[in-house]
């Protein structure tokens, strides 16, 4: 399973997605009357959902029923929730909403890789990708509109950061994919095609940590989507102080976008390295692996010709892992140039 997941991650990084002009259209300034806006149920944890149901005068068990309709059956229309009374369904419609991102464009490649361009209520857009592998596959989801990291090799890095995604917007991406592949009600782990999630789309997950944690806890909840935590990988460009916290709060797999064997090279291609040096990242990874439920770490390494791809660089990487005694895998990624990338 891990080998197939690892290959899916590698394959994901070789695809060029939508042009910058298509992804970011800058409509976040649209005015929305927050006083009349309905509560988005996919923004709520199970406890928060229960509290809202109690507020409208219903019993707490109704929250469990609603949770299963949303996350086990994938229903967005309250009228389809057949075990709820008509009066309750009307009450839910007046107070709440269950929203999916709007599909603006989609593309399926010859190898069945499926790409979506999704739009949220304020007009902002993100990318999502499904990468199939035999009888399973990984869905790559985004956590921010744009990205503040500015990695020189990254297409998203050429866009300005606009905002964090909400909990519902993060979850909504995966639910769009499940709509597309008919995976409602939630299938078992053995037969699901959307078997893995990789949190390595647009944005830096650790800079939207609270929303990402909440979204992943909902996605892995046993009474809903019920995706195993071992089938979720969160990738970071190296926000060292938050690595241990992120892993402790989610229990998912860790991937680190390393891309260089030393600080000199990494700072050239990843500005974040001037703030969090390789040594600090490695120490955080080592601290994480001291934990009882730690897993192998994947280090993502994009091969840039003449910059980080020599035999000496490979030896440096080996010595780096030995120094910090890390249990890790390297994901070697061929670079797929995009217009204006400079490589």
For each of these PLM feature ranges, what is it?
Residues 31-137:
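Flexible, acidic/Gly-rich N-terminal and inter-domain linker regions that tether
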Residues 5-6, 15, 24, 33:
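Intrinsic-disorder-associated, low-complexity terminal segments enriched in Asp/Asn/His/Tyr and depleted
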């Amino acid at each position: 399973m891990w080998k197939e997941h690892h290959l899916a991650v590698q394959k994901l990084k070789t695809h060029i997605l939508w042009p910058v002009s298509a992804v970011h259209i800058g409509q976040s300034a649209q005015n929305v009357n927050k006083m009349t806006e309905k509560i988005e149920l996919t923004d709520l944890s199970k406890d928060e959902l229960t509290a809202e149901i109690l507020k409208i005068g219903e019993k707490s068990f109704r929250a469990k029923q609603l949770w299963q309709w949303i996350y086990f059956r994938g229903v967005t229309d309250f009228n389809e929730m057949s075990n709820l009374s008509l009066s309750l369904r009307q009450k839910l419609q007046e107070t709440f909403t269950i929203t999916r991102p709007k599909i603006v464009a989609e593309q399926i490649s010859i190898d069945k890789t499926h790409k979506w361009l999704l739009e949220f209520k304020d007009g902002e857009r993100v990318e999502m990708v499904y990468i199939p592998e035999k009888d399973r596959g990984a869905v790559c989801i985004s956590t921010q509109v744009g990205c503040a990291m500015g990695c020189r090799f990254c297409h998203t890095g050429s866009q300005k950061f606009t905002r964090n995604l909400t909990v519902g917007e993060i979850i909504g991406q995966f639910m769009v994919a499940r709509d597309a592949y008919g995976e409602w009600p939630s299938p078992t782990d053995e037969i699901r095609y959307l078997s893995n999630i990789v949190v390595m789309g647009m944005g830096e997950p650790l800079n939207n940590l609270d929303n990402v944690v909440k979204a992943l806890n909902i996605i892995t909840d046993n009474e809903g989507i019920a995706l195993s935590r071992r089938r979720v990988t969160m990738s970071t460009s190296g926000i060292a102080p938050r690595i241990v916290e992120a892993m402790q709060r989610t229990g998912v797999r860790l991937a680190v976008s390393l891309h260089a064997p030393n600080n000199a090279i990494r700072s050239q291609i990843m500005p974040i390295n001037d703030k969090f040096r390789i040594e600090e990242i490695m120490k955080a990874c080592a601290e994480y692996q001291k934990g009882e439920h730690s897993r192998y770490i994947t280090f993502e390494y994009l091969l840039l010709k003449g910059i980080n791809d020599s035999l000496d660089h490979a030896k440096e990487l080996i010595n780096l892992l030995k120094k910090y005694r890390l249990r890790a895998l390297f994901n070697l990624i061929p670079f797929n140039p995009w217009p204006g990338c400079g490589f």
